Regions:
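N-terminal secretory signal peptides
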Residues: 1-13, 21-31
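Sec/Tat signal peptide C-region and signal peptidase I cleavage site
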Residues: 33-37
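Compact, glycine-rich, soluble single-domain proteins
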Residues: 38-162
Length: 162
């Protein structure tokens, strides 16, 4: 090929027409590659929520959080599209009276697991937009200081998974 042929208008059009699909393909893989780069050190297992009655504006979800990383991580926030707010709460017994309070600083040491189960911690779903119905599920996002957002699908069931 002669030097002038390499820079001809038809060659430039061909290179440009091949470049557009190549760039589109590269762009379509950017999100999955970015998702793989996220530090997946927090595992969430055994998620479930109890069904609620019609008209009930609060619900609760349960699960186990495990830090598989090498550094302590901290739960910063929770969110879900099915409620106005999601908060981690702790139930405590004092003087024969059960009460609950928001937990604002849950730390997970390396290798540690935290049970979020009835009678202790629970994810309080405040301002439910519709009842939690057995057999359905919803997404819940837990954002950690180091691991970032971890999304879990929470099935609604009358009994915890085994």
């Amino acid at each position: 090929m002669k030097r002038n042929e390499a820079h001809s208008p038809s060659r430039r059009r061909t290179r440009r027409s091949l470049a557009t699909p190549a760039l589109a393909l590269l762009a379509s893989t950017a999100l999955p590659i970015a998702a793989l780069a996220v530090d997946a050190t927090i595992s969430i297992t055994g998620a479930w929520a109890r069904p609620t009655l019609r008209g009930t504006r609060t619900g609760a979800a349960y699960m186990t959080l495990t830090n598989r990383g090498q550094a302590t991580d901290r739960l910063l926030s929770l969110s879900t599209p099915i409620a106005d707010r999601a908060e981690l709460h702790e139930e405590t017994m004092s003087g024969g009276v059960m009460s609950m309070k928001p937990v604002t600083d849950l730390m997970l040491r390396p290798g540690a697991s935290v049970q979020i189960d009835p009678g202790h911690y629970h994810v309080m779903l405040i301002g439910l937009r519709s009842p939690l119905v057995a057999g359905e599920s919803f997404s819940l996002s837990l954002t950690f200081e180091k691991a970032g957002a971890v999304v879990v699908t929470v099935p609604v069931t009358t009994m915890p998974p085994h």
